[in-house]
Amino acid sequence: MQEIRNIAIIAHVDHGKTTLVDRMIYQANLVRQPENLGQLILDNNDLERERGITILAKNVSVIYKGVKINIIDTPGHSDFGGEVERVLNMADGVLLLVDAFEGCMPQTRFVLQKAIRMGKKPIVVINKVDKPNCRPDEVQEEVFDLMFNLGADERQLDFQTVFGSAKQGWMSMDWRQPTDSIAPLLDTILSEIPAPAIIEGTPQMLISSLEYSPYVGRIAVGRITRGELVSGQHISLCKRYDIVQKQKVKQLMVFEGLGKANVDKVECGDICAVVGIDGFEIGDTIADFENPEALPPIAIDEPTMSMLFTINNSPFFGKDGKFVTSRHLKERLEKELEKNLALRVKPGLTADSFVVYGRGVLHLSVLIETMRREGFELQVGQPKVLDKTIGGQRCEPIEELSIEVPEEFVGAAIEISTRRKGALVHMEPRGDRTLLEFEIPTRGLMGLRSNLLTASQGEAVVAHRFKEYQPYKGEIERRNNGSLVSIETGEAIAYSMNKLLDRGRFFVEPGEPIYGGQVVGEHTRERDLNINICKTKKLTNVRAAGSDEKIVLPPAIKFSLEEALEYIQEDELVEVTPHAMRIRKILLDPLARKRNSDNEDC
């Protein structure tokens, strides 16, 4: 029987997890090197490549010195915490990757805490030691202190540290002596990470992840914790609430390199994919046919935020997308629930609306962006934070926020955060930059990143993670400016936009199609202003021919999806179609809006 090591790679966002896995793949000669250099093999979803972040957990295996190493790449963002937790169930040890300059960041702490609670043995990899001003030795001390504070035991604190640069493709036990390969890291994995315990008995496997194939449907992925599975075997599927279904394994696959290989039998401790099981959910157990014993299901963090999803009912409905009806929207959200653990969906107040609960703006905006690329048209409301009543008191989610800014912008960063009910808990200079740590309500994070980047000339590094529920902190002021709202449907005309430049900043370019009720700009004052930017210049013979002035308009402000979601107010929606994104009022008719606001004033 082949020796196996199961290992998960955990780290803060963008410290180089996926690049490191790529290096391991090259080391094991799974890919011819020159052709794919420079692009990540594992982040194979368009969105992941564009944003440079890992969203979905992935499995790969490499053979080194005759030992099979199963590598699981995990996402670093706490918004995808649901992914991290279920993946750690499959691993025996973790590779903790830390940036040699940035050190331990909030997300490092978030993922490490989960691994330590599960009793996993860590190996610390200090990456990017080729960067100027890096401080590998200090970072190693930081990691030790962090593990100690998180309550690690002696076995976990006695960790091995490997230094290197995944990008340049070397690892070494001493950062001052570069090598020419990452072999030292692979040797450390073999010596430090325990082989999975072989437990004889009836089969048991916890389904920790799932894949989808257009040919065979849903495939269950997990690690066999006891016994062995054989292709064609009859098994029991143990679901929640003690429901047991009798089923049959049609096909078994193990991970080999970047793909999968069919096998007849999988031994205890290996990670495998099972085909032919219907109606399973993540957290179910595959157990013996006659005496089923279920494993405890996976506990996932609760959602902290909700958003209204509804079909697109604007005047431009159906011009852009393929899937536009509420039936399409409902089916797509149900399909997403199958694999997205931290998501919940409930029907909204009307038949064509749904309330979607998630872990944060990033988590939900990745879903919206994926749907947009698939050809969906939909509208999304302002994100709402979920409150809880604890002991008769209204409580809201609080996050730990860390901001790293150059010294001259510290005052601005503190002011922006405290205005949003943030409390400064720690401040530490790091070279010419300063690290600020706050406790801040989740509500206060909306729109915070764009404000901080503007105030710090794009230099701020922002990260946050959920901490706990605390008593409600009071109202937070939202943006003060009203909107410029179009009252006509047609094309935006430069002539009339030029006349309204002193009233605010525009979100649309001349020539763009707009409709009545669309938000076309930000007003300089507090109230909304209804404007007509579809008016053309009257061409009569009275005017002198040469008196036309050249119109110079400032460029329009373009939002990303997250920025738009954080920008809108309660009476606005973001309309998302495959080729456009617009902000609109919920009530398109100006008279209906006026009646509504008069009623609220009364």
Segments from the language model and where they lie:
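Signal for well-folded cores of large energy- and translation-related assemblies
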Residues: 25-29, 63, 85-92, 99, ...
